Amino acid sequence: MAANCTSSWSLGESCNSPGSEPPQSMPSPATQLGNHDSDPETCHVNFRMFSCPKESDPIQALRKLTELCHLWLRPDLHTKEQILDMLVMEQFMISMPQELQVLVMMNGVQSCKDLEDLLRNNRRPKKWSVVSFLGKEYLMQESDVEMAEAPASVRDDPRHVSSQRTSSVNQMCPEEGQASQELQTLPRVPALFRRQEEDFLLPETTVMKGDPKALRPKPTLEKDLEEDREENPGLTSPEPQLPNSPTGVVGAKEGKEPQKRASVENVDADTPSACVVEREASTHSGSRGDALNLRGLKRSKPDATSISQEEPQGEATPVGNRESPGQAEINPVHSPGPAGPVSHPSGQEVKELLPFACEVCGKRFKYRGKLAVHTRSHTGERLFQCNLCGKRFMQRIGLQFHQRTHTGERPYTCDICQKQFTQKSYLKCHKRSHTGEKPFECKDCKKVFTYKANLKEHQRIHSGEKPHKCSKCPRAFGRPATLRRHQKTHREATSQ
């Protein structure tokens, strides 16, 4: 029926049905255009949405369809090739995804040849995305707000994630204001990481690359905003280290008035319950290997037999230099100073509870597998490879996040604009574009930023730091994007 109608208006006559009278002659295009104020696109919609009532005259319906088709395709103005392109383009727009529909509309494509050239160039619509709202999909223009992301190396050590499950600050000393403010902004990590930590490879399956003693840990820096957005979110913050000073204060007797102190509560995946570690805000200088890792230690009540009688009260004892190797508990001693009391385990106790130590930085772990995962942060070893693109990761959880870029899975949805994200940290950063929150402030000029990566980049202006060095010349840069642009000059010079 549609084919017959298409041929009928091109010949200037309508289709006849058996036994019916011949229809009247078609009105001229000028008469049709004068009777209809609608544009061709409106006639196109009316033509496709036309419905004939049951009791209406089919001949009149046929005339109406022919008229609408004539007003849409305009055979008096267009050639047969142009009309064919219009029909093919219409079916293309119906059957193709919404992204390609936007691409055609944005570029004003009018012919199949132009559309083929557009598709060969692999062009894609910019600043548009498909969002779901109330069960329906809509095209939405994206905002210009950029989102920050930390590099994949921030989760090289699973204890960096598990130790910061919950963080709170109870009281704050005047000299501890800086450290306490940092503790208040520690991010909460989803329980997914605790479940994934059991999947790390055992040490027997880990192959060490290079000499660990000759390597040093790489500094954890925020990635530039123009880096890949779909790897891993920044989830770590400086962990509490034990002061290595002979005048360190340990323990506090019950019944005495507590002094102001900063209390940090860390939940570790290695232990079934949380432990509270009270530390001094100002740490003294010392080798990193001597700084003991307090995570995973459970506080236990001191036993009468475990308290050394040889050390007088009021005299502080350096941690790790106990003369009695069998001493398993903490001696309650005091030292004068402004800092509050801090609980310190003995060196022997740390070695028993955390028997596996890193040869590079001295950090200790309860399980050998955890040490093997941590060592990858020094060696740069990446055991988990994506089977689609070949990209490698240090941990399985990083690979799982990356695979969402291939599958298109976006489980986290903004409840304001319904935009979806692959990771919860991305959603948290995105919500700041709605609230206008700028939680990161520069200490030098008091300028505030929405994302921490922006603050890190801004602080390099004050410090003059240029951590990104070119491997082919002595120049260094403060931003990775600037380094990439500089490296292009070397490649262009080599190609010429």
Swiss-Prot record:
GO terms for cellular component: nucleus. The keyword Kinase does not apply. Residues 1-19, 161-171, 234-247 have a biased composition (Polar residues). InterPro entries: SCAN_dom, SCAN_sf, Zinc_finger, Znf_C2H2_sf, Znf_C2H2_type. Residues 44-126 form the SCAN box domain. GO terms for molecular function: DNA-binding transcription factor activity, RNA polymerase II-specific; RNA polymerase II cis-regulatory region sequence-specific DNA binding; zinc ion binding. It is found in: Nucleus. Residues 1-38, 149-188, 203-347 are annotated as: Disordered. Residues 210-223, 253-263 have a biased composition (Basic and acidic residues). GO terms for biological process: regulation of transcription by RNA polymerase II. Its main location: nucleus. Pfam families: SCAN, zf-C2H2, zf-met. May be involved in transcriptional regulation. This is Zinc finger and SCAN domain-containing protein 5C. It comes from Homo sapiens. The lineage of its organism: Eukaryota, Metazoa, Chordata, Craniata, Vertebrata. The gene is ZSCAN5C.
